[in-house]
Protein backbone atom coordinates (compact mmCIF):
# COMPACT_ATOMS: atom_id res chain seq x y z
CA UNK A 1 0.00 0.00 0.00
CA UNK A 2 1.04 3.62 -0.49
CA UNK A 3 0.06 6.25 2.06
CA UNK A 4 -0.20 9.61 0.28
CA UNK A 5 0.35 13.22 1.31
CA UNK A 6 2.43 12.74 4.45
CA UNK A 7 4.79 15.53 5.57
CA UNK A 8 7.94 15.84 3.47
CA UNK A 9 10.39 16.22 6.33
CA UNK A 10 13.08 13.91 7.66
CA UNK A 11 11.80 11.40 10.24
CA UNK A 12 8.23 12.65 9.77
CA UNK A 13 7.02 9.07 9.17
CA UNK A 14 7.51 8.26 12.86
CA UNK A 15 4.12 9.69 13.98
CA UNK A 16 2.36 7.66 11.28
CA UNK A 17 4.14 4.40 12.09
CA UNK A 18 3.86 4.86 15.85
CA UNK A 19 0.09 4.65 15.45
CA UNK A 20 0.68 1.01 14.50
CA UNK A 21 3.50 0.07 16.86
CA UNK A 22 7.19 0.70 17.47
CA UNK A 23 9.69 0.32 14.65
CA UNK A 24 12.49 -2.22 14.64
CA UNK A 25 16.04 -0.99 15.05
CA UNK A 26 18.81 -2.54 12.93
CA UNK A 27 22.44 -1.75 12.23
CA UNK A 28 21.17 0.49 9.39
CA UNK A 29 19.70 2.81 12.09
CA UNK A 30 16.14 4.13 12.07
CA UNK A 31 15.31 5.64 9.74
CA UNK A 32 17.89 4.43 7.26
CA UNK A 33 18.77 6.66 4.34
CA UNK A 34 18.21 5.49 0.75
CA UNK A 35 20.34 8.01 -1.08
CA UNK A 36 23.32 8.04 -3.44
CA UNK A 37 26.54 8.61 -1.46
CA UNK A 38 30.30 8.46 -2.21
CA UNK A 39 32.03 5.18 -1.31
CA UNK A 40 28.86 3.23 -0.47
CA UNK A 41 29.00 -0.04 1.48
CA UNK A 42 25.59 -1.13 0.18
CA UNK A 43 24.05 -1.06 -3.29
CA UNK A 44 21.04 0.83 -1.91
CA UNK A 45 23.35 3.82 -1.43
CA UNK A 46 24.18 3.99 -5.15
CA UNK A 47 22.33 5.17 -8.24
CA UNK A 48 22.36 1.65 -9.72
CA UNK A 49 19.28 -0.39 -10.53
CA UNK A 50 18.22 -2.84 -7.81
CA UNK A 51 16.63 -6.16 -8.74
CA UNK A 52 13.53 -7.14 -6.79
CA UNK A 53 14.72 -8.42 -3.43
CA UNK A 54 13.94 -9.02 0.23
CA UNK A 55 15.76 -6.84 2.75
CA UNK A 56 18.07 -8.47 5.31
CA UNK A 57 17.68 -12.13 4.23
CA UNK A 58 20.84 -12.98 6.18
CA UNK A 59 18.98 -12.32 9.44
CA UNK A 60 17.54 -15.33 11.26
CA UNK A 61 14.39 -13.23 11.70
CA UNK A 62 14.19 -10.63 8.90
CA UNK A 63 11.89 -7.65 9.45
CA UNK A 64 8.32 -8.49 8.57
CA UNK A 65 7.37 -5.11 7.15
CA UNK A 66 9.17 -2.21 5.53
CA UNK A 67 8.13 1.40 5.02
CA UNK A 68 9.86 3.64 2.47
CA UNK A 69 9.10 7.34 2.89
CA UNK A 70 9.79 9.43 -0.22
CA UNK A 71 11.25 12.86 0.56
CA UNK A 72 12.61 13.78 -2.88
CA UNK A 73 12.41 11.98 -6.23
CA UNK A 74 13.55 14.55 -8.78
CA UNK A 75 16.16 12.49 -10.63
CA UNK A 76 15.64 10.92 -14.04
CA UNK A 77 14.93 7.22 -13.42
CA UNK A 78 14.58 5.75 -9.96
CA UNK A 79 11.14 4.25 -10.59
CA UNK A 80 10.05 1.58 -8.12
CA UNK A 81 9.08 -2.03 -8.79
CA UNK A 82 7.37 -4.69 -6.70
CA UNK A 83 6.34 -8.31 -7.14
CA UNK A 84 4.12 -10.57 -5.06
CA UNK A 85 6.55 -13.46 -4.64
CA UNK A 86 3.80 -15.66 -3.18
CA UNK A 87 1.99 -15.43 -6.53
CA UNK A 88 5.16 -16.41 -8.37
CA UNK A 89 5.73 -19.32 -5.98
CA UNK A 90 2.13 -20.44 -6.42
CA UNK A 91 2.56 -20.38 -10.19
CA UNK A 92 5.62 -22.62 -9.88
CA UNK A 93 3.84 -25.02 -7.53
CA UNK A 94 1.02 -25.44 -10.04
CA UNK A 95 3.05 -25.44 -13.26
CA UNK A 96 6.71 -26.30 -12.59
CA UNK A 97 6.67 -28.63 -9.59
CA UNK A 98 10.28 -29.80 -9.80
CA UNK A 99 11.58 -26.24 -9.69
CA UNK A 100 9.19 -25.39 -6.86
CA UNK A 101 10.31 -28.40 -4.80
CA UNK A 102 13.96 -27.46 -5.27
CA UNK A 103 13.31 -23.91 -4.06
CA UNK A 104 11.56 -25.29 -0.97
CA UNK A 105 14.03 -28.02 -0.08
CA UNK A 106 17.51 -26.66 -0.83
CA UNK A 107 18.73 -23.96 1.60
CA UNK A 108 20.69 -20.97 0.35
CA UNK A 109 23.38 -19.10 2.20
CA UNK A 110 22.78 -15.36 2.49
CA UNK A 111 25.61 -13.21 3.76
CA UNK A 112 26.57 -9.65 4.55
CA UNK A 113 30.12 -8.45 5.11
CA UNK A 114 30.19 -5.00 6.61
CA UNK A 115 33.77 -3.87 7.10
CA UNK A 116 32.65 -0.48 8.42
CA UNK A 117 31.19 -2.23 11.47
CA UNK A 118 33.59 -5.21 11.51
CA UNK A 119 30.68 -7.65 11.21
CA UNK A 120 30.09 -10.67 8.99
CA UNK A 121 26.56 -12.09 9.06
CA UNK A 122 25.12 -15.17 7.35
CA UNK A 123 22.08 -17.44 7.48
CA UNK A 124 20.90 -20.54 5.62
CA UNK A 125 17.28 -20.76 4.46
CA UNK A 126 15.36 -21.96 1.40
CA UNK A 127 14.07 -19.41 -1.11
CA UNK A 128 10.50 -20.53 -0.38
CA UNK A 129 9.50 -21.35 3.19
CA UNK A 130 6.21 -23.11 3.97
CA UNK A 131 4.12 -23.42 7.12
CA UNK A 132 3.28 -26.83 8.57
CA UNK A 133 0.01 -26.67 6.61
CA UNK A 134 1.80 -26.03 3.32
CA UNK A 135 0.94 -22.33 3.09
CA UNK A 136 3.58 -19.80 2.13
CA UNK A 137 5.45 -18.42 5.13
CA UNK A 138 8.08 -16.23 3.52
CA UNK A 139 10.27 -15.74 0.47
CA UNK A 140 14.01 -15.12 0.81
CA UNK A 141 15.51 -13.93 -2.43
CA UNK A 142 18.24 -11.37 -2.96
CA UNK A 143 20.80 -12.10 -5.65
CA UNK A 144 23.13 -9.40 -4.34
CA UNK A 145 23.47 -11.12 -0.95
CA UNK A 146 23.48 -14.79 -1.98
CA UNK A 147 26.70 -16.61 -1.25
CA UNK A 148 28.12 -19.43 -3.38
CA UNK A 149 25.84 -22.46 -3.55
CA UNK A 150 26.55 -24.99 -0.83
CA UNK A 151 24.93 -28.19 -2.03
CA UNK A 152 25.87 -31.64 -3.33
CA UNK A 153 27.59 -31.49 -6.75
CA UNK A 154 24.91 -33.76 -8.20
CA UNK A 155 22.27 -31.15 -7.30
CA UNK A 156 24.19 -28.10 -8.51
CA UNK A 157 22.74 -27.86 -12.02
CA UNK A 158 19.19 -28.40 -10.77
CA UNK A 159 19.57 -25.74 -8.06
CA UNK A 160 21.04 -23.18 -10.45
CA UNK A 161 18.23 -23.84 -12.91
CA UNK A 162 15.57 -23.40 -10.22
CA UNK A 163 16.94 -20.11 -8.93
CA UNK A 164 17.53 -18.76 -12.41
CA UNK A 165 13.92 -19.52 -13.29
CA UNK A 166 12.61 -18.01 -10.04
CA UNK A 167 14.68 -14.86 -10.55
CA UNK A 168 13.37 -14.42 -14.09
CA UNK A 169 9.75 -14.82 -13.00
CA UNK A 170 10.23 -12.26 -10.23
CA UNK A 171 10.85 -9.72 -13.00
CA UNK A 172 8.30 -11.03 -15.50
CA UNK A 173 5.70 -8.53 -16.71
CA UNK A 174 2.99 -11.04 -15.73
CA UNK A 175 3.81 -10.51 -12.06
CA UNK A 176 5.72 -7.26 -11.62
CA UNK A 177 4.26 -3.79 -11.08
CA UNK A 178 6.14 -0.54 -11.70
CA UNK A 179 5.38 2.88 -10.26
CA UNK A 180 6.99 6.12 -9.22
CA UNK A 181 7.05 7.34 -5.65
CA UNK A 182 6.20 11.00 -5.13
CA UNK A 183 7.32 13.21 -2.23
CA UNK A 184 5.12 12.46 0.76
CA UNK A 185 4.40 8.86 -0.25
CA UNK A 186 5.05 6.04 2.23
CA UNK A 187 5.34 2.70 0.44
CA UNK A 188 4.46 0.01 3.01
CA UNK A 189 4.81 -3.70 2.31
CA UNK A 190 5.38 -7.19 3.67
CA UNK A 191 9.15 -7.65 3.39
CA UNK A 192 8.79 -11.44 3.44
CA UNK A 193 6.30 -11.53 0.58
CA UNK A 194 6.54 -8.45 -1.62
CA UNK A 195 9.99 -8.11 -3.15
CA UNK A 196 10.95 -4.60 -4.21
CA UNK A 197 13.46 -2.89 -6.47
CA UNK A 198 14.13 0.21 -8.54
CA UNK A 199 15.46 1.34 -11.89
CA UNK A 200 18.78 3.11 -12.29
CA UNK A 201 18.70 6.87 -11.84
CA UNK A 202 20.93 9.77 -12.85
CA UNK A 203 22.11 11.63 -9.74
CA UNK A 204 23.27 14.53 -11.92
CA UNK A 205 19.71 15.17 -13.09
CA UNK A 206 18.21 15.70 -9.65
CA UNK A 207 18.13 14.45 -6.06
CA UNK A 208 16.52 11.23 -4.85
CA UNK A 209 16.11 10.58 -1.12
CA UNK A 210 13.99 8.02 0.70
CA UNK A 211 13.99 7.14 4.39
CA UNK A 212 13.32 3.55 5.41
CA UNK A 213 11.81 1.95 8.50
CA UNK A 214 11.28 -1.67 9.57
CA UNK A 215 8.65 -3.23 11.78
CA UNK A 216 8.30 -6.81 12.98
CA UNK A 217 5.42 -8.88 11.65
CA UNK A 218 4.28 -9.65 15.21
CA UNK A 219 3.58 -5.94 15.75
CA UNK A 220 1.39 -5.70 12.65
CA UNK A 221 -0.51 -8.92 13.42
CA UNK A 222 -1.03 -7.87 17.02
CA UNK A 223 -2.48 -4.53 15.98
CA UNK A 224 -4.77 -6.15 13.38
CA UNK A 225 -6.03 -8.68 15.94
CA UNK A 226 -6.84 -5.86 18.34
CA UNK A 227 -8.70 -3.86 15.69
CA UNK A 228 -10.83 -6.87 14.75
CA UNK A 229 -12.36 -6.97 18.24
Where are the predicted features?
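Active-site environment of non-heme Fe oxygenases that use a 2-His-1-carboxylate facial triad
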Residues: 1-229
Amino acid sequence: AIVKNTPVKKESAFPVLNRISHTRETFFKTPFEVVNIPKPNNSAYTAHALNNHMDLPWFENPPGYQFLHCLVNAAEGGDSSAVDAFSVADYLRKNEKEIFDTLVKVPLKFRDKDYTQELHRSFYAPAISLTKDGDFNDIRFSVATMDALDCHPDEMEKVYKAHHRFGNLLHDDKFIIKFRLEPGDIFSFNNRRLLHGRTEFDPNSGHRHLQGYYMDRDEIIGRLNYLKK
